[in-house]
Structures are given as C-alpha cells and as structure tokens.
C-alpha cells in the first residue's frame, strides 16, 4: 500500500501518501469485563483515536491499548465498564471551534459517563491526555482520571517484573 500510494503521489501530486507505519484499524470489540470476585469497578472511556487505530506495526505485543488496559485492570482486581454506545461518543475537543457540536458531544459524553459510573460512584479513566483535559475542564461531579494517573493508583496491586529492555511511554 505504501509503495503504491507513494508512486501515485509522485506521478500525480494529488494522491495522498500512506506511509508503511500508518497504524492499522483497531478491530477490538469493547465489551464490559466483569469478574464476580472483584469488588472494584472502573469506567473506561477509550477515545476516538485510540478506538480507531491500534499501535504501529513492528512491536512484539500486538494487543490494542484497550486489551492492555483490561489486562492490567484484571491483574489489579478491577472490573472494566465501557460507557453505553461508546462507538458514538467523543469528548468534543475536535469540535472545540464549533460551539454547538462541542456542547452536544460533551453533553452526550457526560450522560453516558454518569450512567456507566452509576452517578459518579466509580472512577472514570480517559486514555488520551488532551481528551482527558477537555473533559475534565467541562464535566463536573464525576471523578475523571487520565490513564497514567489511574495506572499509578493501581500499581501497588500489580506484580511488576523488572526487565532489561527499552520501553516507550507516550
């Protein structure tokens, strides 16, 4: 695909170039993960970009971000709850310059997060910092956490094996 798009781009100057490193579509289905033995719950709002794409090719771990998050929550003893109709939800940041669309996106997200968190009983994790910031500024009355903040809080519940490898933190 990359070679074809590059050749077409060079010939016509009109066709977009699709690089080899372009992330592939994320086909992972988001469903609640509940274990009756777990007493703790977390609402996970996976953002538009992270729902649309999986990680770049070339990594040993081919799981989606959602699968990794679910795995860490499982190891820490947390049930994972997705907001209803997550595929239609957006924090509104992309529409910030379109006030009515931004307000509607935030209203829809607030309603879904309120329902999923049972009125704010459970913490809500957002997996993209810019989207977290936008939601955090505009949604009141719910405990909204950036994914890194939540992972820091569950770290004591995880058995972490040190490794001598390079890791990427984004």
Which residues are covered by each model-predicted region?
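Iron-sulfur cluster-binding electron-transfer modules in prokaryotic oxidoreductases
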Residues: 1-170
């Amino acid at each position: 695909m990359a070679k074809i798009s590059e050749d077409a781009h060079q010939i016509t100057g009109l066709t977009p170039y699709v690089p080899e490193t372009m992330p592939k579509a994320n086909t992972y289905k988001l469903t609640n993960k509940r274990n009756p033995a777990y007493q703790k719950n977390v609402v996970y709002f996976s953002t538009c970009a992270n729902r649309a794409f999986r990680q770049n090719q070339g990594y040993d771990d081919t799981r989606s971000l959602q699968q990794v998050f679910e795995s860490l929550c499982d190891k820490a003893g947390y049930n994972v709850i997705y907001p209803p109709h997550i595929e239609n939800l957006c924090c509104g940041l992309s529409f910030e310059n379109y006030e009515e669309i931004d307000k509607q996106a935030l209203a829809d997200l607030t309603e879904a997060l309120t329902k999923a968190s049972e009125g704010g009983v459970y913490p809500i994790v957002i997996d993209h910092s810019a989207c977290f910031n936008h939601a955090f500024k505009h949604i009141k009355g719910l405990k909204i956490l950036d994914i890194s903040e939540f992972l820091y809080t569950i770290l004591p519940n995880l058995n972490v094996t040190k490794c001598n490898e390079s890791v990427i933190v984004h």
